[in-house]
UniProtKB/Swiss-Prot annotation:
Reported tissue expression: Selectively expressed in pre-B lymphocytes.
Statement: the UniProt record of this protein carries the keyword Methyltransferase: no
Quaternary structure (record): Interacts with VPREB1A. Interacts with SYNV1/HRD1 (via N-terminus); this interaction leads to increased IGLL1 ubiquitination and degradation in pre-B cells, possibly through a lysosomal, not proteasomal, pathway.
Encoding gene, per UniProt annotation: Igll1
First and last residue of the signal peptide: 1-30
Record key words, sorted: Disulfide bond, Endoplasmic reticulum, Immunoglobulin domain, Secreted, Signal
Name of this chain's protein: Immunoglobulin lambda-like polypeptide 1
One GO CC annotation: extracellular region
């Protein structure tokens, strides 16, 4: 379409205005897909402005009621609703256009179980206490050990949080002593701090007899 002398952008049809904008930006060759609402169901959106396999910033235009991402040739299409969510969330478009939104998993307090050393462990001249912490979310916490009320760090080993099948987390913490160190003390405690709350479990060598 040719522009007549004196014709302004305000009189140009909307489609031509968008095309002219792309020409001015020099991005016509980079436009691969502009999605319509009917084609959105065939795309899977990772998130607003996200592009799988690329960390480069994305350019968005607003020709209508959708936000469209201008992406390089060969990349898959992406689109998102015009009204973006006000707080962070994960969302996907899949199947026949069904959108799944995960607003955030609720907090879950940890379940703490403290295990005494096994008889076989003690016969090998070792005493390993196991503090199993499970069912917590978010997946960050602190595990501390005490012997007769005194904090200890020597002989302590704690695993990194691992995700359970229910999307909650679990960790294991170990306190390893030699048998001679195990018997003289009366109380061993595992203390877990999660989201400002503390859970403590204790055992005694007398419980092994």
């Amino acid at each position: 379409m040719k522009l007549r002398v004196g014709q302004t952008l305000g009189t140009i049809p909307r489609q031509c205005e968008v095309l002219l904008l792309l020409l001015l930006l020099g991005l016509v060759d980079g436009v691969h897909h502009i999605l319509s609402p009917s084609s959105a169901e065939r795309s899977r959106a990772v998130g607003p402005g996200a592009s799988v396999g690329s960390n480069r910033p994305s350019l968005w235009a607003l020709p209508g009621r959708l936000l469209f991402q201008i992406i390089p040739r060969g990349a898959g299409p992406r689109c998102s609703p015009h009204r973006l969510p006000s707080k962070p969330q994960f969302w996907y478009v899949f199947g026949g256009g069904t959108q799944l939104t995960i607003l955030g998993q609720p907090k879950s307090d940890p379940l703490v179980t403290l295990f005494l050393p096994s008889l076989k462990n003690l016969q090998a001249n070792k005493a390993t206490l196991v503090c199993l912490v499970s069912e917590f979310y978010p997946g960050t916490l602190v595990v501390d050990w005490k012997v007769d009320g005194v904090p200890v760090t020597q002989g302590v080993e704690t695993t990194q949080p691992s995700k359970q099948t229910n999307n909650k987390y679990m960790v294991s913490s170990y306190l390893t002593l030699i048998s001679d160190q195990w018997m003289p003390h009366s109380r061993y405690s595992c203390r877990v701090t999660h989201e400002g709350n503390t859970v403590e479990k204790s055992v005694s060598p007398a419980e092994c007899s």
